[in-house]
Amino acid sequence: MTSVTLRNVCKAYGDNLISKNVDLEIAEGEFVVFVGPSGCGKSTLLRCIAGLEDITSGDLYFGKERMNDVPPSDRGVGMVFQSYALYPHLNLFDNMSFGMKLAKADKSEIKKRVNNAADILQLGHLLERQPKSLSGGQRQRVAIGRTIVSQPNVFLLDEPLSNLDAALRVQMRIEIAKLHKQLGCTMIYVTHDQVEAMTMAEKIVVLDGGYVSQVGKPLELYHYPQNRFVAGFIGSPKMNFMSVFIEQVEDERVMVQTADGKAFWIPVDGTTVTKGDRMSLGIRPEHLVSAEEGDTSIEGTVQVVEKLGYETQVYIHLDHVDADFIYRRPDTLQVEAGDSFKVGIPAHRCHLFHSDGRACRRLYQEAGI
């Protein structure tokens, strides 16, 4: 295993710049997830690390060795793709050992590595089978096993769970997380699914339009997003937003006024805020409370109620707010579409964003950070 460093890395196709000035440090043995919407450049960046795409400018290092001009086959990387890429006419043993056989490795070493990988992935009893007899989850484990057999310095996984159904995705992400702990290797995982990112990563890299929007631990990004994009992307359901007017400003708190004239203090860094500004207030659906518990409250008309048994999600239409406000609470809630509904906003759970998307630093200390 090795560390991976990107310094001012750019990737362009003609005049179209995809990856833009990416600076990133990935420690040896770290599990890092690249996450972002479609077209943000996450897979392109992974392919640049693998050597499948040339870097237009900037530097890529594995440890202290510059890798820009090193061929993919000499980089010591192993890739797992969304497509399993298994040979249908070969059994599992031959699929997993194919690369080693091409390299003319010793037969005893091949057998040792394949059996070891099969034991780790619980595939030992299936090695004589062909891929067509396996489930989607088993096929993906074979693809991962093939990478383990090659003993790479860096594992690169490009949306490996996208072809699986919801239940299998949950199972496989647990297995991949266990695999990382078992092998202790450097892993870089690409996904558009922020739930996968939050549950698997030691560190998340959020990409937006080719730029790195924020890097941090999952709970850091959840509780302390540095901009509105990260705030809206991380978390499901996504964060609620509403426009507010700045009434008063102090160094460690800001008084905001909502569209219905209610004013309250928010504990955020006020040194970059100006009285009279229009800003955006954010609050997560799960952080809304009953009207009586909040520092202020909002009232609207219920549009949709999603009753999931273990929780209820209420979509509330508010005047002067573009999108429905979402209120999320555990268990069940007796409310129906068309009802008038009031919820409370706890000031210490609020986020405040400038018009350009920059976040004001929250001063409330969340547990576990």
Swiss-Prot record:
<dbReference type="GO" id="GO:0005524">
    <property type="term" value="F:ATP binding"/>
</dbReference>
<keyword id="KW-1278">Translocase</keyword>
<dbReference type="Pfam" id="PF08402">
    <property type="entry name" value="TOBE_2"/>
</dbReference>
<comment type="function">
    <text>Part of the ABC transporter complex MalEFGK involved in maltose/maltodextrin import. Responsible for energy coupling to the transport system.</text>
</comment>
<dbReference type="InterPro" id="IPR013611">
    <property type="entry name" value="Transp-assoc_OB_typ2"/>
</dbReference>
<feature type="binding site">
    <location>
        <begin position="36"/>
        <end position="43"/>
    </location>
    <ligand>
        <name>ATP</name>
    </ligand>
</feature>
<keyword id="KW-0067">ATP-binding</keyword>
<dbReference type="GO" id="GO:0015423">
    <property type="term" value="F:ABC-type maltose transporter activity"/>
</dbReference>
<keyword id="KW-0547">Nucleotide-binding</keyword>
<keyword id="KW-1003">Cell membrane</keyword>
<protein>
    <recommendedName>
        <fullName>Maltose/maltodextrin import ATP-binding protein MalK</fullName>
        <ecNumber>7.5.2.1</ecNumber>
    </recommendedName>
</protein>
<dbReference type="GO" id="GO:0055052">
    <property type="term" value="C:ATP-binding cassette (ABC) transporter complex, substrate-binding subunit-containing"/>
</dbReference>
<dbReference type="InterPro" id="IPR047641">
    <property type="entry name" value="ABC_transpr_MalK/UgpC-like"/>
</dbReference>
<dbReference type="InterPro" id="IPR012340">
    <property type="entry name" value="NA-bd_OB-fold"/>
</dbReference>
<dbReference type="InterPro" id="IPR015855">
    <property type="entry name" value="ABC_transpr_MalK-like"/>
</dbReference>
<dbReference type="InterPro" id="IPR027417">
    <property type="entry name" value="P-loop_NTPase"/>
</dbReference>
<keyword id="KW-0762">Sugar transport</keyword>
<keyword id="KW-0997">Cell inner membrane</keyword>
<dbReference type="InterPro" id="IPR017871">
    <property type="entry name" value="ABC_transporter-like_CS"/>
</dbReference>
<keyword id="KW-0813">Transport</keyword>
<keyword id="KW-0472">Membrane</keyword>
<comment type="similarity">
    <text>Belongs to the ABC transporter superfamily. Maltooligosaccharide importer (TC 3.A.1.1.1) family.</text>
</comment>
<dbReference type="Pfam" id="PF00005">
    <property type="entry name" value="ABC_tran"/>
</dbReference>
<dbReference type="GO" id="GO:1990060">
    <property type="term" value="C:maltose transport complex"/>
</dbReference>
<dbReference type="InterPro" id="IPR008995">
    <property type="entry name" value="Mo/tungstate-bd_C_term_dom"/>
</dbReference>
<comment type="subunit">
    <text>The complex is composed of two ATP-binding proteins (MalK), two transmembrane proteins (MalG and MalK) and a solute-binding protein (MalE).</text>
</comment>
<dbReference type="InterPro" id="IPR003593">
    <property type="entry name" value="AAA+_ATPase"/>
</dbReference>
<feature type="domain" description="ABC transporter">
    <location>
        <begin position="4"/>
        <end position="234"/>
    </location>
</feature>
<dbReference type="GO" id="GO:0016887">
    <property type="term" value="F:ATP hydrolysis activity"/>
</dbReference>
<dbReference type="InterPro" id="IPR003439">
    <property type="entry name" value="ABC_transporter-like_ATP-bd"/>
</dbReference>
